[in-house]
Amino acid sequence: MAWKNGWKAACGALLMLAALSPSPAPAQVPDDVLVVGQIAEPKSLDPHAVTATNDFRILMNLYDGLVRFRSGTLEIEPALAEKWEISPDGKTYTFTLRRGVKFHDGTPFDAEAVKFNFDRMLDDKHPQHDTGPFPLAFFFSAVERTEAADPRTVVFHLKEPYAPLLSNLAYPTGLIVSPEAVRKGGKDYGRKPVGTGAYRFTEWQSNTKVVVERNPDYWNGAPKLQAVIFRPLTDANTRLTELLAGGLDLMVEVPPDAVDLLGKAGGFKLHEQAGPHLWFLILNTREGPFKDVRVRQAINYAIDKEALVKGVLQGTATVADSIVPAAFEWAHDDKLQPYPHDPDRARALLREAGAEGAELKFLVAEGGSGMLAPVPMATAIQADLAKVGLKVTIQTYEWNTYLGLVNQGLAGKGDMAEMAWMTNDPDTLPFLTLRTEALPENGGFNSGYYSNPEIDKLLLQARQSTDRDARAELYRQVQRIVREDAPWAFVANWKQNAVTTERVQGFELQPSFLLNLAHVSKAAQ
């Protein structure tokens, strides 16, 4: 494949240049500073205002939540809350807060601060609600009200039982911001973030870097590093060049061919971690050819997903079979099979639907969180669809521009769009993207306008059930119906990766796809 050979040639040339060039000066990156190569510029440093893992990787180091994911797992453990109790009816969660914690601006972390955070997101009459929008406030839609019972006790009163609450509180949308900083910053708060985390914000130079520095008073022990610099490098070749030249200590989302070549170069460590990731195509079910379920099914048959994961992704992913990634073992339907590659079946469905030779506009990101190799993936998909007679035009966009476009819905913009989600609970992705109430005009992420009342009912039942086995069966029903309705083309589940220099110590990738640098250090030159 031309794209593959081109990337390999580029990587090979970069490695040759690195070998011929003198070694970088030891002072280029100080021993107590970590430089991270990110895939894009962050949209905001307000955890309640963003949706991208690219942004979350920074935010997890500036803020804490009431709870967090235990390292190496998706299990919940205490963070800013020391402990919690759940009422027998599952509708009241009472959290006891950690003593003596302060925000980076010196203001106290207490129950009133927690109440402020959730009221700001959920109450449209709150004085700081206009500092939004808050696209993932859906995570806490079951919360009727929050109560600061005393300075160290905060109570969440729910409208109904809500099984994913603790998991959602551990997600970046549950991170706690300084109320005083929000009041001072207003709509610009996302450029001047203040949390309780291991690092505190120093500066943000647009399209150049975000700098955070060590919080010496961190409640969980001060970091070993003095600072972390996050550099937005959207081009994979540029990230690789910087890594080889000594300008980066850590590179996230490494292209498959680069992984192989970096291994040969020496001096680097590869980190891999499986997690609940899904790469898919959103199909516009409101207008155009994809209004017909037969055309949506045809797309799923036409795309050679095995070739994509083995070729474009070099075996770093598996073929996706449903909306619930297999990483959620307890909820995934193991009996469900991916759509097989069957061009003849695809052509037959297109004939039945009267969609032979249809012209499709395909929206594609140039990069982005979990998007893998979006342009090569799109080019390969375009070729597969051409083989069944479909004429696909690709239009590419910068990541944040792309998110803004696609999240508002595909109507009037395109027929299909790439997307990737990394989730924390089987509820998250379908509830935010496939319910009728999650249409873009309602503030949700159902950008393809899929609507099925049975799915709406099952998802509501699943999130209200406190019996894990009952929830699992409901999610299996959802998977079977969604596979048949085919509102998306299900493509790949990715195993995330990162590369560090051998000097970096204490770094681990997490199944949550988040980046925790509190315990990372660097060996001296």
Where are these regions (language model features)?
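Structural transition elements
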Residues: 319-352, 369-376
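Aromatic- and charge-enriched surface segment that lines or borders ligand/interaction sites
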Residues: 82-127, 155, 242, 289-291
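Extracytoplasmic/peripheral linker and loop segments enriched in polar/acidic and small residues
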Residues: 387-404, 431-502, 524-525
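Surface-exposed binding/hinge segments that line
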Residues: 96, 115, 133-180
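Gly/Pro-rich hinge or "lid" segments in bacterial periplasmic/extracellular proteins
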Residues: 70-71, 162-223, 227, 237, ...
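Long beta-strand-rich cores associated with HINT superfamily self-processing modules
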Residues: 498-525
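N-terminal lobe/hinge region of extracytoplasmic solute-binding protein
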Residues: 37-88, 119, 126, 192-194
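Ligand-site clamp/hinge motif
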Residues: 190, 215-261
